[in-house]
Regions:
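Sec/Tat signal peptide C-region and signal peptidase I cleavage site
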Residues: 17-21
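Exported/periplasmic ABC-transporter solute-binding proteins
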Residues: 22-67, 72-77, 81-249
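Bacterial N-terminal signal peptides
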Residues: 4-15
């Protein structure tokens, strides 16, 4: 029985290795990177990778489950730490790639005005609606938003009125479709969606630094290293900047 289990484990590992070697490079990236990273991939002079976009928590769980990923770009340090602590990253390949800002958004036709500050009447501004957030317990954008609202003393007002989404782009879509009157997303998400407008910007001191770390996943090939290096060069960084991301190096 033990021998059979050992053989099965070997076959599974060989299957993952074969998937890495035979198919295109697979990149897992935070959903908020979609537009910018798609453009970066088009500019890449090598073999173009396949990029999967989702919440960083979802990606981290899939990597933990053995997904044949070469490069992981998260939207916060926590999920990268999670994988590092469990030995899923190649030592020495982790870098902080980009920064971002957190904003409160509404539909363009909305006349709602709300100054972001301690004790702001956020619940009143929502009326009968809900506040769209990426899941505040485990998705980076939602965690940043919860931290900011707690620091402002208004989380208790709205915690039972959250329209929770699996990632920040899904939260953005709730506002764009008019299903939620307000949402908290990244500045770069607004740049990618004409059907929302910024009501206010959260001061960076209200939440942990919004950082997108990048690392190579254990078992990644040399082509993963080449693409990761391209993400940090001038051409790629200029594309990210054009989409509203901040340079960190």
């Amino acid at each position: 029985m033990v021998a059979r289990l050992a053989m099965l484990a070997c076959l599974l590992l060989l299957g993952v290795s074969s998937a890495r070697a035979s198919g295109p490079l697979l990149v897992f990236a935070a959903a908020s990177l979609r537009n910018a990273l798609d453009e970066v991939v088009q500019a890449y002079p090598g073999e173009r990778p396949v990029v999967s976009y989702a919440g960083s928590s979802t990606h981290a769980r899939h990597i933990e489950g053995g997904a044949p990923v070469g490069v992981f770009i998260a939207a916060d340090r926590d999920w990268m730490d999670y994988l590092h602590d469990r030995g899923f990253l190649i030592p020495g390949t982790r870098h902080d790639l980009l920064g971002n800002r957190l904003v409160l958004v509404a539909r363009p036709g909305s006349e709602l005005a709300l100054a972001i500050g301690p004790g702001m009447p956020l619940a009143q501004a929502l009326g009968d609606g809900r506040l769209a957030l990426a899941h505040p317990d485990h998705v980076p954008a939602g965690k940043y938003a919860r931290s900011a609202l707690e620091r402002l003393g208004v989380w208790q007002q709205v915690k039972q009125r959250i329209a929770s989404a699996g990632n920040v782009r899904a939260a953005l879509a709730l506002v764009a479709r008019g299903e939620a009157p307000l949402g908290i997303v990244y500045q770069t998400d607004v740049n990618a969606e004409p059907k929302v407008r910024v009501v206010g910007r959260f001061d960076a001191s209200l939440h942990p630094p919004i950082v997108y770390p990048m690392a190579l996943v254990r078992g990644a090939e040399r082509r993963a290293d080449a693409f990761a290096e391209f993400l940090r060069n001038e051409r790629a960084q200029r594309i990210f900047e054009n989409h509203g991301f901040a340079r960190l190096h």
